[in-house]
């Protein structure tokens, strides 16, 4: 959960649905001093069935033992404490978490939120079902709701269904212009960049594994998935006055717009864990498009590329080097709503810039992190860690070959904290990023990538 321009948009239209990277976010704007407190309380109830040896052997056939030996490191002293011994295997368990959150800032006002999540492991890898529900509201008019479902073996045991539903009402949404490459002084007149908006989003992704296909390279095919996706978004600004930038520029979509995208793609995932990867790599490539005649009032084509690499090494403590390289391209033009452009800034890319800072036809971006756990209490299933990160990115309105990429390079850097409570797969994260225009603070659940 976060507060930098309260965003319940866990997935924007032109962003990937990521396995267990689901973040519930908003943020505490970079334009004002930090005047917020964040209160978290987690109530977790876990019922664990300890496996006898025959059951353990059966479970190993359908799960990745490395995932469990790395991530299920609990010490069990009673049924009321969480977990199993380090050499035990979680065969059937359910983790339920409840997080109330309270924050105050001059931008958002007094905001309250609630995250409820349920993670059922079952006898399959990585889990049987992952459900999360988020609600958020503030005294200045923010209201939002988010439902997320990740369901492996939804229709058969080689598929996976991901559903994401978002509805929100903002009184202080952000618009900084389309393809704005000049530095913005946010402190002078921050209200100029704000506007009121209402948004509904529906994201569906259906994945099919190729691990049943006969092929010489069995390792590759066991980690290869193809997928189909559908996305719908409706967004409309409302009741804004002529002093706000969005009403002065009146970009396409300022009076409301909607789009429906169909997509297809493939991904390879060799990570040892989807929640806190230590080794392996991940690559997802996707093409999606909308047609004006099919539930859309504009036509658009998008290409999304996301590749990640993880390597653990030891320097006094075990440290994970994590690297993500992303590229997004669209044929966006004057008929494309401003909110459907690929976007740099905010929590995903260039932490330290505000959300929606750069609305551009195409961009590349990198995230580089060093992650480590600094303290662990096996009695309470508690781990505390930290991160150091550097982000970079660039954008252009030209072609890949002729675009002026070097003139638009941006950098941010920062650090963060990690807390794992009760379950090693439930991680709270806070990032503090710095840019030439200010800073950004992001509270979220799960690793960024």
Put a short name on every predicted segment.
Residues 262-384:
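C-terminal outer-membrane beta-barrel translocator/porin domains of Gram-negative envelope proteins
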Residues 117-119, 150-152, 203-209, 265-269, ...:
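Transmembrane beta-barrel domains of outer membrane proteins
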Residues 1-84:
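Cleavable N-terminal export/targeting peptides
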Residues 96-98, 110-114, 143-147, 198-202, ...:
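Hydrophobic, lipid-facing positions within transmembrane beta-strands of outer-membrane proteins
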Residues 88-98, 102-254, 258, 427-429, ...:
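Gram-negative/organellar outer-membrane beta-barrel architecture
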Residues 85-94, 121-129, 154-160, 210-225, ...:
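Short loop/turn motifs that connect adjacent beta-strands in outer-membrane beta-barrel proteins
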Residues 229, 236-260, 316-318, 363, ...:
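Outer-membrane beta-barrel transmembrane domain signature
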């Amino acid at each position: 959960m976060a507060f930098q321009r309260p965003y319940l948009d866990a997935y924007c239209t032109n962003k990937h649905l990521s396995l267990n990277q689901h973040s519930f976010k908003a943020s505490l704007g970079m334009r004002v001093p930090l005047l917020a407190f964040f209160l978290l309380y987690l109530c977790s109830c876990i019922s664990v069935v300890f496996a006898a040896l025959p059951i353990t052997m059966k479970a190993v056939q359908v799960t990745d033992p490395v995932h469990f030996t790395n991530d299920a490191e609990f010490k069990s002293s009673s049924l009321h404490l969480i977990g199993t011994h380090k050499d035990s295997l979680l065969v059937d368990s359910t983790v339920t978490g409840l997080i109330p959150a309270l924050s105050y800032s001059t931008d958002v006002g007094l905001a309250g939120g609630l995250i409820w999540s349920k993670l059922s492991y079952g006898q399959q890898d990585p889990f049987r079902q992952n459900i999360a529900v988020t609600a958020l509201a503030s005294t200045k008019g923010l209201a939002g709701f988010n439902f997320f479902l990740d369901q492996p073996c939804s229709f058969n045991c080689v598929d996976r269904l991901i559903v994401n539903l978002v509805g929100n009402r903002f009184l202080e949404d952000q618009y900084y212009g389309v393809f704005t490459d000049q530095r913005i002084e946010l402190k002078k007149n921050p209200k100029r960049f704000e506007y009121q908006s209402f948004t509904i989003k529906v994201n569906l992704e259906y994945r099919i594994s190729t691990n049943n296909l006969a092929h010489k390279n069995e390792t590759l095919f066991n980690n290869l998935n193809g997928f189909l996706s559908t996305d719908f978004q409706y967004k409309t600004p409302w009741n804004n006055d002529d002093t706000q930038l969005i009403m002065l520029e009146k970009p396409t979509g300022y009076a409301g717009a909607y789009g429906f995208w169909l997509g297809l793609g493939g991904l390879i995932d060799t990570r040892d864990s989807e929640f806190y990867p230590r080794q392996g790599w991940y690559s997802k490539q996707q093409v999606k498009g909308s047609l004006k005649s099919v539930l859309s009032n504009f036509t658009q084509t998008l290409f999304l590329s996301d590749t990640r690499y993880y390597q653990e090494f030891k320097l006094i403590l075990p440290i994970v080097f994590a690297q993500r390289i992303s590229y997004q391209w669209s044929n966006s033009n004057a008929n494309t709503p401003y909110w459907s452009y690929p976007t740099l800034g905010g929590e995903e890319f260039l932490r330290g810039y505000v959300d929606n800072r750069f609305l551009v036809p195409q961009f590349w971006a990198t995230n580089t992190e060093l992650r480590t756990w600094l303290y662990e209490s096996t009695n309470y299933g508690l781990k505390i860690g930290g991160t150091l990160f550097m982000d970079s990115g660039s954008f252009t309105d030209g072609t890949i070959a002729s675009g002026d990429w070097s003139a638009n390079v941006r950098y941010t850097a920062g650090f963060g904290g990690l807390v794992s409570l009760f379950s090693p797969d439930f991680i709270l994260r806070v990032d503090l990023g710095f840019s030439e225009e200010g800073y950004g603070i992001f509270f979220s659940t799960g690793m960024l990538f």
